[in-house]
Amino acid sequence: MFHFLFSLLLLGSIHGEPIKINLITTNDLHGVIGKQKANFMNPQYPPTILGGAAFAKYVDELKIETEKNGEGLLILDGGNFFQGSPLGLVDNGYTMIEWMNRIGYDAMVPGIYDFISGAENLNELSTKATFPFLYSNLDCNNCPLINSNIKPYIIKEIEGVSIGILGVVNSQIMEFVLAENLSGTNAEKEVYSIRGWIPDMKSSGADLIIILTSSGVPWNREDEYEMFLQKISRGEIDETS
């Protein structure tokens, strides 16, 4: 899914002038970057979505524009990037990584479906990427996800602003992915990881922190939130920790 462009307006610390940083996010691409008909928009007369080629052209033009205007640009992906189409599955994600390298992504976080070909495959894909794979809540002491391009977070300096990007994997991965594909990977609850890493990121100089995740929102979010509040009231969760 290609998302719209967001712009972050920050106040410059030196002259008080606004700093503009453009943010592009994608998620759940599932290897679908070819031209296609948008039947979900109009089943009878579906418009054409030009896909990955048009997106690449758009990003190229935006890079020129932002550089000309003295603005920053950040491109992030929220995971589930290759499973779900023949293009993505034929080589277990390598073509998608090549396309993402061409776009110039700054970082991505793996989604649950990115483990469909196993943790070893995901580790190998990360070595081919020109951008880091981020996760902060996977316990990976004995799993294959151990190369130098896999990190809990990064801090990028853009237009004088230190932007921290923290990767958080959906903790339900333990329920939806076969144990043999996880290869010993265990997931910590998202909130505990976020609370643990943000102080470290701030002490490392992050002025602004972005949580990059494919956790989504549960369909029964009202019930889940009510259960969360009940656990706090029973002392099962320390909301101050």
Please give the residue ranges for each predicted region.
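Sec-dependent signal peptide recognition
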Residues: M1-S7
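Hydrophobic h-region of N-terminal signal peptides that target proteins for export
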Residues: S7-G16
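Acidic, metal/ion-coordinating pockets
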Residues: E17-S241
